[in-house]
Amino acid sequence: MMLRAVFRRASIRGSSSASGLGKSLQSSRVAVSAQFHSVSATETLVPRGNHAHSFHHRSCPGCPDCSRTIINGYQGTALQRWVRPFSSDSGDVVEAVVPHMGESITDGTLAAFLKKPGDRVEADEAIAQIETDKVTIDIASPASGVIQEFLVKEGDTVEPGNKVARISTSADAVSHVAPSEKAPEKPAPKPSPPAEKPKVESTKVAEKPKAPSPPPPPPSKQSAKEPQLPPKDRERRVPMTRLRKRVATRLKDSQNTFALLTTFNEVDMTNLMKLRSQYKDAFLEKHGVKLGLMSGFIKAAVSALQHQPVVNAVIDGDDIIYRDYVDISIAVGTSKGLVVPVIRDADKMNFADIEKTINGLAKKATEGTISIDEMAGGSFTVSNGGVYGSLISTPIINPPQSAILGMHSIVQRPMVVGGSVVPRPMMYVALTYDHRLIDGREAVYFLRRIKDVVEDPQRLLLDI
């Protein structure tokens, strides 16, 4: 009522100044006080330029003067000074959103929250993780502040741009999250005592003689006992992760699409292991990375792909796409599943470049920080099951590739060398290929080239 009176008086007088408005406010409040015989104080605005300098409490006529300053230096428009003089700013609130996750990824599952409501976070600090078909992506806080609330739940499907959390960035931000309080359980009402049935005096009835009971039936034949199923409380049902779903779908598609066939060979690892043992210290000192066996097989695979380019090709509809580059994927097992990062232009790399690239990609894959771009593409895959102790296996093709090489564990076996039986470090290698595109002859030649280069690495120097 006071505010409407102020604006009504100001509009009638045609005055828009702060001082005129202040007088209107004072006169209207005095009138109200006189009507209700109130002794409450009135507010008077003392303008100074474009700032409200102070408010004073003054008593009504006949009361002693008593004044004190309420606020100093309040700045704003005339409407703000009169409409919201005592409101407090609750602070800025920013919202954390789902980032862009790659060209081929449209959504993901919110896997876990890394913070709780009420926790303080810094700018760019991870507050949640999104699991996609390929990688795990962090959601970062856009600014420093305190998490007020989360707008989604774990397990929800989210898309780029969806809001995930509200974060207060005010200086005195505090958590407004109260501990969950359980509603007091009301005691269950006590059951009322059953109503007593009226007693009825029964008259004695003459008892009839009982009929003779029939003879008991013969015992039935016992059927075979059904097998006891394990109790349900000893089983756990866990939803599949998006990565596991994606792997399952791709492997089944590979099995349904390709004419899978696997051929095997065995490789004598003596010379490659001798080369590694002889130069590993000098290699580490110069390049800052250890010399492993994987780089030797990558170089051998590059040479074999150059000798048999059809293994590096792929069927696309009614066409065959021949790739004039060699991008080799390496299978890396992680706690969350299998990922396959790519070594780009492996045909242009030396041993040191390959080892550095493998170590960097494997570290990112293990830590879950590998990007979508680092796993896209690839023309051929090398999988090393030997690090887990696998003796032999039949790997499955990684679409849209046409072949995959499987390495296995190195085992000392008796071999005939120069007419004598000697122990040799041997490895089985397997090539699974799409028989629609690759004939058995090309597959055998490919594996034979792998065997020749690994058993005699000097071939790489002479290009023979």
From Swiss-Prot:
EC number: 2.3.1.61
GO biological process: L-lysine catabolic process to acetyl-CoA via saccharopine; tricarboxylic acid cycle
Entry keywords, A to Z: Acyltransferase, Lipoyl, Mitochondrion, Transferase, Transit peptide, Tricarboxylic acid cycle
Compositionally biased intervals (Pro residues): 211-220
Keyword Transit peptide part of the UniProt annotation: yes
Residue ranges, annotated region (Disordered): 168-242
Modified residues (N6-lipoyllysine): K134
Transit peptide start and end: 1-86
GO cellular component: cytosolic ribosome; mitochondrion; oxoglutarate dehydrogenase complex; plastid
Active site per the UniProt annotation: H435, D439
Cellular compartment(s): Mitochondrion
Source species, domain of life: Eukaryota
Annotated InterPro entries: 2-oxoA_DH_lipoyl-BS, 2-oxoacid_dehydrogenase, 2-oxoacid_DH_actylTfrase, Biotin_lipoyl, CAT-like_dom_sf, Single_hybrid_motif, SucB
Function recorded in the entry: The 2-oxoglutarate dehydrogenase complex catalyzes the overall conversion of 2-oxoglutarate to succinyl-CoA and CO(2). It contains multiple copies of three enzymatic components: 2-oxoglutarate dehydrogenase (E1), dihydrolipoamide succinyltransferase (E2) and lipoamide dehydrogenase (E3).
Protein name (Swiss-Prot/TrEMBL): Dihydrolipoyllysine-residue succinyltransferase component of 2-oxoglutarate dehydrogenase complex 1, mitochondrial
Lineage: Eukaryota, Viridiplantae, Streptophyta, Embryophyta, Tracheophyta
